[in-house]
């Protein structure tokens, strides 16, 4: 007793200290994040998320613990207290269990508890450490009542030995120290459940704030909002309540089985009447949850991947849903029956259990189990028989209504129903006069691709080791073609397709000898400048032509060098410091007594002090201590370089920045930089990130190879590269999901009309969304059920040679005039070929300019016309003797020829094919444009420039 008392006296202070440590750390997290969200102007957004997370986490934890420990307390009260059967105060009401049976049952229950604990722990971990590269979807929450859950657990154990060892340890602990281990597991299990519930705060908010779609599903007639906003919450509640219910039942059973020294005596006397009534009550509750499970499963048939189409097919509608109903009824009746026995159960006669046929005692309890299994197995057999005898012989007739549903739903969910389909009949009418009429299209033909341009930038424009170009992006700018006599006069300008690349600071490239705390957090704080290249121009030596490049000019050492005065007027540059970007992964403090490296100049450096709006004051007082704790950076406390104005700039990675503010949105993988004047003299550079609302809950919508079956580009996010401010602009006000989030966070979103005009002119149709739609359109352009069923008109994404390897054609941006338009637009285009063939069948275009933004156009070629596809043109190019001879000569001459993207360019009612050839010398990796190949109909030419190639192609001189 003294030893136990000493242990208790030691444990209490330790637990108290650990508790204070955890609470203190949580307090630091909350206060630090509150200050950051205040700086961003989104404190209300953070507080709403936090309050729901805390409320749901604590609420579910308290309810779960209350239920579990109340039942364990009842079990302690009702368990056998004495070891001798003749002295039991209550007669057993069930047969006794020998030692072998006791060990088998206890081991099985312990293994199940251990498996549940591991499963719920992994689920909680996945919710609180999300992979933002994956779609942000309603989690696949498999209930322990599902066979798929058992299969998943067994798979995990077989592939991870340590999980099996943990389960074995828990089983052993439950056999030896039952009460102690049950209490520990109860607490851990409850904590995991509370993390899961808190991590699903978004589902709760969507449930209460959900905006109806005003579209009903074709099977049950529910508004689609029920499936997207409400059904995920019911699945979550099932997961929570089922987990608590099963664990509590098993914990109570173990408590009863190991009472009365049953392991020592080698036998369990049987369950008493109070024990049985307790177990009946728990079983009754689980049967009630099984009813909920079958109700949910009936709705989940609308996402069935089996059958001819995605969603509920003939068998699901005529058999599957009724099997779920019958199984639910059986579970409901069983729940009522067990509930009645728990409330009004009468004492059975003891002599019944001394009968030699005592196994018959279990018969009434096995009836619902057998009935349940019979219905389930019969349903599987009947479904298979009907599939073979009724459906397969007349599959199109039987499945036609469900094919129509899938086509209609998939097209609506991916916005394919908004596509304006037209016929494009190519004519042999392309000549010099037509080219002149479409000179803006010709002047914007993309010879430079982002990949070779980045390679060139890294060789010629990085300037210092610590600078890096992480990415390059296609955009368009209005470039002036003449200078006005007076500034206030209207400027004459043309659209110019360009490639822009940010020169960011890559601290990982700083030499090890210079890798100090001061350099990392006080000196190397930002990148500087960008390059801007027209896609169609080539400088001397085949290098890119730059509108904007370098750092420093004769007039101003901090300015970027521009190609002409016209570019000075066209492109706002200012002091292009990049404090927030794609590589800014570390936090910095500024201003301090240490000057920041601004940019290199000659053999030295120019220094600067940040004067932007970003950052949290940490120069003095408690905030310095707070963020030293939050960042675990004790150097902050001892640094003598801070001033009262010193600010902390953290979460400077733009993806992490926007995900922290709005984690419920999905973000495009490719943010792009924009140089635009929004009225701030110190900030001209901005990042635009496309954000999506997605779901995997749209009934009958086929996700294909994706994990989601509904998507909208609902939000455009703008991040200031200097100040770090973030603005969310709603781009699709008709999307019910973004309408729901706007109701939840009314101060988070702005109308797209509020975006500055200079930025709005740079929004573009996102490639990620377009690629998804283009992939879905391969099959779902077929709207006739019979054509769809037979796959008579299946399309494919064509192949091209890029570099030296074949690859699928990616979408590409063009400035071109659509067939029915009178002016050039910024277009995203994707070609198609028929299945197993190489000729073109169609091309899809997405518009990006002004009021036309977001409109999709599909131009289909007449099926009787043969139009060359990319692979066929590539073959013609490689078969041309002059071209192949020249390429072979280069490849033998210490260089390597890389083929660029083959662009198919619609010009009025004709198609022009253009492919640049890059030359890379063996001694360096700088790609240069060596030749441009142009094809029209059966004619192919290769010349040093695009202009020469076009002149030769349309002059009739191809000798």
UniProtKB/Swiss-Prot annotation:
Principal location class: membrane
Glycoprotein recorded as keyword: no
Protein origin, superkingdom: Bacteria
Localization per Swiss-Prot or TrEMBL: Cell membrane
UniProt membrane topology term: Multi-pass membrane protein
Any one Pfam family match given in the protein's UniProt record, by short name: UPF0182
Record's GO cellular component terms: extracellular region; plasma membrane
InterPro entries given in the database record: UPF0182 (IPR005372)
Transmembrane stretches, start-end: 13-33, 50-70, 99-119, 156-176, 184-204, 239-259, 276-296, 319-339, 362-382
Keywords for the protein's UniProt record, in alphabetical order: Cell membrane, Membrane, Transmembrane, Transmembrane helix
UniProt entry tagged with the keyword Transmembrane: yes
Family that this chain belongs to: Belongs to the UPF0182 family.
Matching HAMAP family: UPF0182
Name this polypeptide is given: UPF0182 protein MAE_41360
